[in-house]
Structures are given as C-alpha cells and as structure tokens.
C-alpha cells in the first residue's frame, strides 16, 4: 500500500490494517488459519510474486471512480477469479467472461453519480438502520482494536465513515460481504473453482487472444524502437 504523506484518512486506513493484523496475530485460535499482511511500496517486483499466487482478485473501487486499471487483467490472466464492482476494466471482463464467471457487487456508476448529483447519500442512516454494517463499523473502535492501535487514528476513521463517507464505502458494504461469502463458498467447491480458473484464460472468451495480439504489437513497436536506437548510435 501507498499513501501520500498529507492524506490523513489513507494513513488511518493503513493504521487500521496494521492494527487488525496485530489483533489477529495475537489470537491463538485464529492466527494459525488467518493472516493480514500489508505489502508496503507495492511495485512490479512484488507484483511478479503476488499475482501468480492469487486465488481471488478483489477490484473494489467505487463504481465511476476507476478510469480503467490493468491490475485486474494481470490477475485474471494468471488464473485468479475476479471479485469487484462494475467499474473500470471489470466491466469489459464481465462482458467477455459472462456474469456467471465473475463476482460483481455494489451500485452501478449511474447510481453512484446520481447520489453525488442529488447529494442524497446518507452514511449515518445506513449505519443506523443496517445491523451488519453497524457491527462492522463499530469493530473499528472496539476495545480489542483500541487496545492494539492508536485510539485517535481509529476514532478519526470511524467518524469519517459514519459522518461523511465520501467514497460511499457503506453503500456497497452489505453487497460486498454477501458476494464474498458466495465466492468463498464456491471456492470450497473444487470443481466450481477449477471451472472459473480455466474460463479466464480460455480463447473462447477472446481475452487471451486479445492480450497476445496486444503483446505482439507492443513487442514489435519496442523492437523497432531498439533497432532505430542502435542505428542512431
């Protein structure tokens, strides 16, 4: 993860992750089976190790906020199943592999934009009316978290989510939890998991063919540039 020095809430989120990692590591019943690891200064070198090892790729930007990233494509081409919002390149992947072969959740871009235009998104109302959402958010300032982390940072993040939540995290939270539960259940079904893993690189869906074509075009262009460079020298 990375965050600009002045991006206070982003730093608070990183602190939340580190605190959660500490809490889980201290739990003797949970720690043998679950780890939370924050990968610092994520870059290409780290990606080369992490992407091939990934089982489920979570691409969970708020719909309408992601222009179009390529990270999800790299995970997908290495056999990871995508779980994400209908945002960025997730939309194209869903169209190519079919809705049955990708886990999507959350509001659409049009719905999110409408909330911004009407200024009618109310995080506090969602927090107060949905017990599951309240339970998740309250855990941020639970005793176990406050004892392990910095209370000022955790309380500031809690207040930001309940009082503002500019990126509408609570809007998609329930849908995310339900969709992830389905993904994990399907992963336990080895035959379903293998079906999804095989589907992604399949030429039937044109994804790999498109990628090969792009790679060949890219390599040809680079080769031309290199040849021209040596001719100049």
Regions found by a protein language model. Give the residues of each.
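Catalytic cores of eukaryotic secretory-pathway lumenal/extracellular enzymes that build
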Residues: 1-12, 16-19, 23-46
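Hydrophobic residues at beta-strand termini and immediately following loops
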Residues: 39, 105, 200
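Short acidic alpha-helix that forms the nucleotide-activated donor recognition element
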Residues: 45-53
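Catalytic binding pocket for nucleotide-activated donors in carbohydrate/polymer assembly enzymes
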Residues: 52-53, 60-195
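A short, well-ordered alpha-helix in the C-terminal region of glycosyltransferases
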Residues: 194-203
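Intrinsically disordered, low-complexity, charge-rich segments with an acidic bias
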Residues: 205-221
């Amino acid at each position: 993860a990375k965050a600009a020095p002045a991006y206070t809430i982003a730093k608070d989120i990183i602190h939340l992750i580190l605190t959660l990692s500490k809490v889980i590591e201290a739990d003797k019943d949970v720690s043998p089976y679950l780890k939370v690891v924050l990968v610092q200064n994520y870059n290409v070198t780290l990606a080369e190790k992490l992407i091939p090892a990934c089982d489920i790729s979570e691409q969970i930007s708020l719909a309408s906020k992601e222009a179009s990233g390529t990270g999800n494509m790299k995970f997908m081409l290495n056999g990871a199943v995508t779980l994400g919002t209908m945002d960025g390149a997730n939309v194209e992947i869903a169209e190519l592999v079919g809705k049955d072969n990708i886990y999507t959740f959350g509001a659409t871009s049009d719905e999110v934009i409408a909330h911004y235009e009407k200024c009618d998104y109310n995080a506090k109302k969602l927090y107060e009316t949905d017990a599951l959402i309240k339970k998740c958010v309250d855990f941020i300032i639970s005793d176990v978290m406050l004892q392990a982390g910095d209370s000022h940072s955790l309380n500031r993040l809690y207040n930001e989510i309940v009082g503002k939540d500019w990126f509408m995290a609570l809007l998609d939270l329930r849908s995310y939890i339900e969709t992830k539960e389905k993904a994990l259940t399907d992963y336990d079904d080895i035959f379903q998991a293998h079906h999804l893993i095989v589907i992604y690189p399949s030429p039937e869906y044109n994804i790999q063919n498109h990628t090969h074509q792009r790679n060949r075009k890219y390599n040809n262009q680079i080769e031309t540039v290199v040849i021209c460079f040596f001719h100049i020298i």
